[in-house]
Amino acid sequence: MSRVFSGIQPTGDPHIGNYFGAMQNYVRLGEQYGKQSLYCVVDLHAITNPGAFDPQTLAQKTFDMAVANFAIGLDPSKVVFFVQSHVPEHQELSWIFTCVTPVGELERMTQYKDKSAQFESVPSGLLMYPALMAADILLYKADIVPVGEDQTQHIELTREIARKFNHNFGETFTEPKAVYNKEALRIPGVDGQGKMSKSKGNTIGILEPFGDIWQKLRVAPTDPARVRRTDPGDPDKCLIGDYHKLFSPPETLETVYQGCRTAGIGCVDCKKMLMTHITEHLDPIQTRAAQLRADPDYVRDALRQGDQEARAIASEVMDEVRQKVGFLKL
């Protein structure tokens, strides 16, 4: 049977771009593949950029990411959900992969080029990031990897590393296949300036207080053609229209689109209708998240169980890897 693996950055509370772009897909895949689907909060990846993480908050953000995923419906009793640093085999396999991967292949990664340009002295962890990512995936012999399109190059390198290892030490790893969520939309930031991103500060968090969400929507830009209330607009050129596609039922969507094009409704009324449906959609998630935070032992026990399940697979694979590489076994 196929096995799914996906890494989740410990960014704390995810935003609606994460939710519609990836998290809902995790739930669907979890229902399809059960315990053959593994989801890992990749806290080791988080520290590859020393200036981009806070050691005082990393543990809490890791915990919060587990809460958020459980709250949207990812059931830890039906999938394997764990924390990367709790399974030391990730680091061990990553080191072995760095020994078979030419530096040039790591240096040509587009993300490395983009991120390294920010540093006067580039941390080596940033360069080795793809080798660790390859270890994350291949350690579980996963063949399905749901990722964003920005990770395509890393998946191709993972496949190349698998081929190199198999050539050098014997057939061991399958070459994983990247799976993209074709239904995922490119969700614009609430400021209208490109894609929603925490680094840009233009997000709507799925666990954000509704009052804060409304304040963001209230001042969010709309179709610039609607200078006056009586001016018709084009909802396809308005980020509020984009958000309605995510949250509103068909009848509301029809009302909004017709009302915008005929100036039958104003932008404020359109935003209020959107806020109603955002609240309806996110309130059960926020309620469940509050319950989980009130019962941290449940979350920690679920993570411990996931750690054990992941290690059971990882230790078996690493025994095979060590034997093929030639390490002494006592």
UniProtKB/Swiss-Prot annotation:
The keyword ATP-binding applies. One of its GO terms (molecular function) is ATP binding. One of its GO terms (biological process) is tryptophanyl-tRNA aminoacylation. Keywords: Aminoacyl-tRNA synthetase, ATP-binding, Cytoplasm, Ligase, Nucleotide-binding, Protein biosynthesis. The keyword Aminoacyl-tRNA synthetase applies. GO terms for cellular component: cytosol. It is an enzyme of class 6 (ligase). Its EC number is 6.1.1.2. L-tryptophan binds at residue 136. A motif ('HIGH' region) lies at residues 10-18. It is found in: Cytoplasm. ATP binds at residues 9-11, 17-18, 148-150, 187, 195-199. InterPro entries: aa-tRNA-synth_I_CS, aa-tRNA-synth_Ic, Rossmann-like_a/b/a_fold, Trp-tRNA-ligase, Trp-tRNA-ligase_bac-type, Trp-tRNA_synthetase. A motif ('KMSKS' region) lies at residues 195-199. It catalyses: tRNA(Trp) + L-tryptophan + ATP = L-tryptophyl-tRNA(Trp) + AMP + diphosphate + H(+). It comes from the Bacteria. Its main location: cytoplasm. Belongs to the class-I aminoacyl-tRNA synthetase family. Homodimer. Catalyzes the attachment of tryptophan to tRNA(Trp). HAMAP family: Trp_tRNA_synth_B. This is Tryptophan--tRNA ligase. It comes from Deinococcus radiodurans (strain ATCC 13939 / DSM 20539 / JCM 16871 / CCUG 27074 / LMG 4051 / NBRC 15346 / NCIMB 9279 / VKM B-1422 / R1).
